[in-house]
Regions:
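Negatively charged
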Residues: 1-359
Length: 359
């Protein structure tokens, strides 16, 4: 019998319980075991997890045994990935995360989890939290008040499709080093409010789809956002159909190259002031205001479109727009104008006149 403890994962014989151990008893356990570092593919997915095409539907419970507290993992990435029927994880107090640097996809597609108590987590060394809670569709509450995010650089898709979350308190988040926030709240369709006033976004380069599908948000204060390094804002607010107003007067878009579908299906927006937008580097504007059906006016006379290649469906479905000033639009590089004004039935005044042929 080995006298050196090892970290391993044990699957019970009925295949319903996954237990994490750090002891010398692995050989004596019935059922299947894997070493904590065993992987199943070149992507680094742990050997006990499943893939998206064939998620695990037998494991109901995961347990961290008391012995596991003596182990010091440096990664917990993908540990519960695609355990679709996992209902509870017990013994979080027995996992020591003081040396963990990567928590990417840790709970990815754990769609049956309704609650997670991570108050014992030490995240002071974690650099990657991308996709961490993605597809946790049944989570109704998530307390991250103990999270130290000072070293995190990737929060992309962190809460993607957490469809049942009605509130999320991130007031303690330090985002000073974060570079990726794309899809961070994508599909959080039950969130009614979101306070990000403490967010430092000075290093963020990607906000693509950040709030897309947050269909219950009635307001969003982004006055503290520094967007001076952001290159992609495509789909950023797409599907935020309950937003009636959006103040982006502080947005620096001088580095932006993608604004496609940025406000797509923001059906309740009645006004949108983009007078401060610098679009001199933007290449994609397709679907930018798609079905913004409550907008009555939009002044884009200052838009520099000299690098834009795609304007297809840009104003499609803007049924309440009565006038649109595009007098400064340079369409020399545009190769796609298909459906640009489709469904703009109230649009009677369009400047310049050459655009009227697309009505």
């Amino acid at each position: 019998m080995t006298t050196t403890p090892e970290a391993y994962v044990h699957l019970s014989e009925d295949q319903e319980t996954l237990t994490f151990y750090y002891d010398t008893l692995r050989a004596e356990r019935d059922g299947t075991t894997w070493g904590i570092r065993d992987t199943k593919d070149d992507y680094g997915n742990p050997a006990w997890t499943a893939n998206s095409a064939s998620p695990n539907t037998t494991i109901l419970t995961a347990v961290f045994d008391a012995s596991f507290h003596d182990f010091r993992p440096t990664t917990t990435a993908r540990w519960f990935k695609n355990l679709q029927w996992l209902e509870s994880i017990k013994g979080f107090e027995h996992i020591n995360t003081t040396e963990v640097r990567d928590m990417k996809m840790m709970f990815f597609y754990c769609e049956s989890l309704t609650a997670l108590d991570l108050s014992s987590f030490d995240t002071s060394k974690v650099e990657n939290m991308g996709w961490m809670f993605s597809y946790c569709e049944s989570l109704t509450a998530l307390d991250l008040s103990s999270f130290d995010t000072a070293k995190v650089s990737d929060m992309s898709k962190m809460f993607r499709l957490c469809e049942s979350l009605t509130a999320l308190d991130l007031s303690n988040f330090d985002t000073a080093k974060v570079e990726k926030m794309d899809g961070m709240f994508f599909g959080c369709e039950s969130l009614t409010s979101l306070d990000l006033s403490n967010f430092d976004t000075a290093k963020v380069t990607d906000m693509n789809g950040m709030f897309a599908g947050c269909e219950s948000l009635t307001s969003l204060d982004l006055s503290s956002f520094d967007t001076s390094k952001v290159k992609s804002m495509g789909w950023m607010f797409a599907g935020c159909q309950s937003l009636t107003a959006l103040d982006l007067s502080n947005f620096d878009t001088s580095k932006g190259t993608y604004m496609h579908w940025m406000f797509g299906s923001c059906k309740s927006l009645t006004a949108l002031d983009l007078s401060n937008f610098d679009t001199s580097k933007v290449e994609m504007m397709d679907g930018m205001f798609f079905y913004c059906e409550s907008l009555t006016a939009l002044d884009l006379s200052h838009f520099d479109c000299s690098k834009v290649k795609d304007m297809s469906r840009m104003f499609e479905g803007c049924q309440s727009l009565t006038n649109l000033n595009l007098s400064n639009f340079d369409t020399v590089k545009v190769t796609n104008l298909w459906g640009m004004f489709k469904g703009c039935q109230s649009l009677t005044d369009l400047d310049p006149v050459e655009f009227r042929k697309f009505l």
